[in-house]
């Protein structure tokens, strides 16, 4: 099976006309959820993907609201709750220099400029102005690292290693 990448998690339905509420797990929701694009639904207890074509997309608060071709009512989409939306690797587009996909960053080891290993990036949050990386260390505690130039000094995707400058108060 072709490699697939998460682009969103379905958290609920929205209204009665078959709209679903999605938390995007991609930096490119406008591109991924463009009308006519294909996504693949992996329902909570299923390993077999369902191919879906996006009929509409709009933003509402912190969510992406989607409708799919062939789905016209809440009764048809309720089963999708807690499902994951994915795209095939062939659907990925080339990025500019120093731009990265979430799946390239997640799993990287974070070290400080003085060589101290902080842990592995397990999640990327997108609260607003910049992404925030969740780093879990050997102590199982989570550290939140902002993806800003003052902090992130080097990203080496091939070695899965990211070097950061620890600003005062960052790890307190």
From Swiss-Prot:
GO terms for molecular function: ribosome binding. GO terms for biological process: ribosomal small subunit biogenesis; rRNA processing. It is found in: Cytoplasm. InterPro entries: PRC-brl_dom, PRC_barrel-like_sf, RimM, RimM_N, RimM_N_sf, Transl_B-barrel_sf. It comes from the Bacteria. The keyword Translocase does not apply. One of its GO terms (cellular component) is ribosome. Keywords: Chaperone, Cytoplasm, Ribosome biogenesis, rRNA processing. Residues 96-170 form the PRC barrel domain. Belongs to the RimM family. HAMAP family: Ribosome_mat_RimM (MF_00014). Binds ribosomal protein uS19. PANTHER family: RIBOSOME MATURATION FACTOR RIMM (PTHR33692:SF1). The PRC barrel domain binds ribosomal protein uS19. An accessory protein needed during the final step in the assembly of 30S ribosomal subunit, possibly for assembly of the head region. Essential for efficient processing of 16S rRNA. May be needed both before and after RbfA during the maturation of 16S rRNA. It has affinity for free ribosomal 30S subunits but not for 70S ribosomes. This is Ribosome maturation factor RimM.
């Amino acid at each position: 099976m072709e490699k697939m990448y998460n682009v969103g998690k379905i958290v609920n339905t929205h209204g009665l006309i078959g709209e679903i509420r999605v938390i995007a797990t991609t930096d490119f929701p406008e591109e991924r959820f463009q009308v006519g694009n294909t996504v693949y639904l992996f329902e909570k207890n299923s390993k077999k993907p369902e191919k879906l074509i996006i009929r509409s997309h709009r933003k509402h608060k912190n969510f992406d609201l989607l409708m799919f071709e062939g789905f016209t009512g809440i009764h048809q989409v309720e089963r999708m709750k807690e499902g994951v939306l994915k795209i095939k690797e062939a659907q990925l587009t080339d990025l500019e220099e120093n731009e990265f996909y979430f799946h390239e960053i997640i799993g990287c080891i974070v070290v400080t400029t003085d060589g101290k290993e902080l842990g592995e990036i397990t999640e990327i949050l997108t609260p607003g102005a910049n992404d925030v990386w969740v780093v879990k260390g050997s102590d199982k505690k989570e550290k939140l690292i902002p993806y800003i130039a003052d902090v992130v000094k080097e990203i080496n995707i091939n070695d899965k290693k990211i070097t950061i400058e620890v600003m005062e108060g960052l790890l307190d």
